[in-house]
């Protein structure tokens, strides 16, 4: 069993990070994982448990969700030659897309509805425009919420934004099922 509280985000997502060939983008992902809240390692993907499958709940649920989203985006890239030139950014966005669900300045009981905007802004402010744009639009059509009146997340407009959204959407369906080994790696 994986001890999510005693492993870094970089350790837990090492396989996914290794799928990024571009050293600058890989470094950006690693550096980002060092500055976001460490609790992302052990928190669930959904603080209420309503919006994700069983594998994404409980301790380490968000990490398992990110592993599936990353696998989904890799498969979507393989099936879509038109985005091969954005492979690095799409994989980075899949890894980082939910790393602002539990932001530093907020209570960690519930996930932050504006996490796409927080993540997008962070990436853009660090020179990663494409990754930021992909993260900002990853929630798809769910752009407003009663929990944060007045805030509107970006909706996908470009094809690559839709792919990033679909990778996340599919991994969050309650009927989605997959297995993980004793090291927390996705079993194919």
Predicted feature locations:
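Acidic/His-rich, divalent-metal-binding segments that scaffold phosphate/diphosphate chemistry
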Residues: 1-107
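Short intrinsically disordered terminal tails
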Residues: 1-2, 185-188
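Histidine-centered active-site/metal-ligand motif
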Residues: 65, 97, 115-116, 120, ...
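Hydrophobic side chains within alpha-helical segments
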Residues: 68, 101, 118-119, 171
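An active-site-proximal "capping" alpha-helix that borders the catalytic cofactor pocket
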Residues: 69-73, 113-126
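Histidine/acidic-rich helix-loop-helix segments that form or flank divalent-metal centers
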Residues: 90, 123-124, 128-185
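Metal-dependent catalytic cores of enzymes that make or break cyclic nucleotides
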Residues: 106-111, 148, 152
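Short, conserved loop/turn and helix-capping segments at secondary-structure boundaries
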Residues: 110-114, 157
């Amino acid at each position: 069993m994986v001890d999510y509280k005693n492993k870094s985000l970089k350790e837990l997502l090492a396989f996914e990070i290794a799928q990024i060939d571009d050293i600058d983008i890989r470094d950006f992902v690693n550096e980002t994982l060092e500055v976001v809240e460490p609790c992302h390692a052990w928190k669930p993907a959904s603080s209420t448990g309503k919006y994700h499958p069983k594998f994404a709940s409980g301790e380490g649920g968000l990490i398992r969700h990110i592993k599936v989203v990353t696998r989904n985006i890799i498969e979507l890239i393989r099936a879509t030659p038109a985005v091969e030139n954005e492979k690095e950014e799409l994989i980075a966005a899949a890894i980082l897309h939910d790393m602002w669900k539990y932001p530093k300045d907020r209570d960690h009981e519930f996930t932050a509805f504006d996490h796409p905007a927080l993540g997008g802004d962070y990436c853009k402010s660090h020179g990663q425009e494409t990754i930021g744009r992909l993260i900002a639009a990853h929630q798809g059509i769910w752009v407003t919420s009663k929990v944060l009146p007045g805030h509107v997340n970006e909706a996908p407009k470009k094809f690559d934004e839709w792919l990033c959204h679909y990778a996340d959407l599919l991994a969050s369906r309650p009927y989605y099922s997959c297995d993980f080994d004793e090291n927390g790696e996705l079993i194919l």
